[in-house]
Amino acid sequence: MNNATFNYTNVNPISHIRGSVIITICVSFTVILTVFGYIAKIFIKNNCTNNDIGLRERIKCSGCEPLCNKRDDISSPRTGVDIPSFILPGLNLSESTPN
């Protein structure tokens, strides 16, 4: 007498359907968010200019720059973290050399 065996005919079809619906909703939500993200990225990229908000000289990594492909900026590849302009508004990150 083994009570641990699982009989697949006793699976509740309602709970099975409910689980499938939840998984489908989660996957659909993820796909919709991804599509909206790409659409928003395209709109933001089209609205960027090479001198966005006039802060390019003061802060090289402005908030819009990672989404824009600047063809005139052929400097060395950027490394590190992009610093949005609204986080450090008073900091001068121009090409300065330490003492």
Curated annotation (Swiss-Prot):
ATP-binding in keyword set: no
Entry keyword annotation includes S-adenosyl-L-methionine: no
Entries under Pfam families matching the protein: NB
Stretches assigned to the Virion surface side: 1-18
UniProtKB keywords: Glycoprotein, Hydrogen ion transport, Ion channel, Ion transport, Membrane, Signal-anchor, Transmembrane, Transmembrane helix, Transport, Viral ion channel, Virion
GO CC aspect terms: host cell membrane; membrane; virion membrane
One function term, GO molecular function aspect: channel activity
TM spans (from-to): 19-40
Membrane topology: Single-pass type III membrane protein
Annotated compartments: Virion membrane
InterPro entries assigned: InfluenzaB_glycoprotein_NB
Glycan-bearing residues: N3, N7
GO annotation, biological process: proton transmembrane transport
Residues on Intravirion side: 41-99
Subunit structure: Dimer.
Name recorded for this polypeptide: Glycoprotein NB
Organism of provenance: Influenza B virus (strain B/Beijing/1/1987)
